[in-house]
């Protein structure tokens, strides 16, 4: 009998990644990926507006001095928290990231690592799949509480308490 680890099963079972599936990462590995990146980018979705999630997200952004894209209606919440961000739809930013000649949010060149948090699962999955197949110049990392099989690296499925501990470890050095 085959036993599957429920921490690395896609949160929505219909999301089949194919032969290339995300690597399961710890907060320490995620932190190392961000530090190693030359031009990382944080994409913040509407699920990050929840106060506890927003607080952790803001601390991570400040800790790593990340340029930020606010998707959906997160722009206002980030602005009120003192975070500068560029408003883009998730589809729009995905299309920009696929273009190797795009100069990035700060005009310093294309991003080499994109970190996602708080994006709605089904749309994030499609964006991650698109980047996986059509943007080989970019690595993707999801620090959501659900495993995203189409990312290059992802946190496992977990409850809020464990997720908040994971996020806290990323900026509590």
UniProtKB/Swiss-Prot annotation:
Pathway assigned to this chain's UniProt record: One-carbon metabolism; methanogenesis from acetate
One matching Pfam family: CO_dh
InterPro entries (UniProt xref): CdhB, DHS-like_NAD/FAD-binding_dom
GO BP, sorted A to Z: methanogenesis, from acetate
Annotated family: Belongs to the CdhB family.
Record function comment: Part of a complex that catalyzes the reversible cleavage of acetyl-CoA, allowing growth on acetate as sole source of carbon and energy. The alpha-epsilon subcomponent functions as a carbon monoxide dehydrogenase. The precise role of the epsilon subunit is unclear; it may have a stabilizing role within the alpha(2)epsilon(2) component and/or be involved in electron transfer to FAD during a potential FAD-mediated CO oxidation.
Record text on subunit structure and interactions: Heterotetramer of two alpha and two epsilon subunits. The ACDS complex is made up of alpha, epsilon, beta, gamma and delta subunits with a probable stoichiometry of (alpha(2)epsilon(2))(4)-beta(8)-(gamma(1)delta(1))(8).
Name of the protein: Acetyl-CoA decarbonylase/synthase complex subunit epsilon
Organism ancestry: Archaea, Methanobacteriati, Methanobacteriota, Methanomada group, Methanobacteria
Gene: cdhB
């Amino acid at each position: 009998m085959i036993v599957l680890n429920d921490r690395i099963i896609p949160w929505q079972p219909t999301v089949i990644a194919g032969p290339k599936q995300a690597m399961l990462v710890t907060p320490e590995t995620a932190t190392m990926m961000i530090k190693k990146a030359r031009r990382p980018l944080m994409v913040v979705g509407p699920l990050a507006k929840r106060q506890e999630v927003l607080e952790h997200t803001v601390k991570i952004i400040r800790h790593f001095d990340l340029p930020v894209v606010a998707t959906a209606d997160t722009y206002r919440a980030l602005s009120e928290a003192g975070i500068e961000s560029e408003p883009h739809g998730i589809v729009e930013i995905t299309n920009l990231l696929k273009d190797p000649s795009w100069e990035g949010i700060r005009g310093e060149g294309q991003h080499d690592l994109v970190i996602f948090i708080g994006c709605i699962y089904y749309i994030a999955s499609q964006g991650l799949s698109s980047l996986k197949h059509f943007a080989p110049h970019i690595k993707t990392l999801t620090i959501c509480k659900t495993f995203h099989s189409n990312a290059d690296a992802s946190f496992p499925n977990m409850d809020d308490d464990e997720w908040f501990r994971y996020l806290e470890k990323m900026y509590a050095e």
